[in-house]
Amino acid sequence: MAHKKAGGSSRNGRDSHGKRLGIKAFGGEHVIPGNIIARQRGTTWHPGLNVGMGTDHTLFAKVEGHVAFRVKTGGRTFVSVLPMTEAAAE
């Protein structure tokens, strides 16, 4: 008994579109409340000061200021927004 699948039945041919993940506002960039800083799957970057996290782990600014990245002990990267008064001082 031959066990050969009938021709013309392709199992390939599926491919999903890119999800446009990554950093949207880089370090030092000016942001306003609600601006998306990073889109991610899981917590590649963690929310720091003045940064909120959505249900899909999207990081967004809570105040107007400049974006700052900081790596803490343990290797976790935290994203913060330094308010305009603090950002001007640095």
Swiss-Prot record:
Gene3D superfamilies: 2.40.50.100. GO terms for molecular function: structural constituent of ribosome. GO terms for biological process: translation. InterPro entries: Ribosomal_bL27, Ribosomal_bL27_CS. PROSITE patterns: RIBOSOMAL_L27 (PS00831). The keyword Mitochondrion does not apply. One of its GO terms (cellular component) is cytosolic large ribosomal subunit. Disulfide bonds: none annotated. Pfam families: Ribosomal_L27. Residues 1-21 are annotated as: Disordered. Keywords: Ribonucleoprotein, Ribosomal protein. The keyword Oxidoreductase does not apply. Belongs to the bacterial ribosomal protein bL27 family. HAMAP family: Ribosomal_bL27 (MF_00539). This is Large ribosomal subunit protein bL27. It comes from Nitrobacter winogradskyi (strain ATCC 25391 / DSM 10237 / CIP 104748 / NCIMB 11846 / Nb-255). The lineage of its organism: Bacteria, Pseudomonadati, Pseudomonadota, Alphaproteobacteria, Hyphomicrobiales.
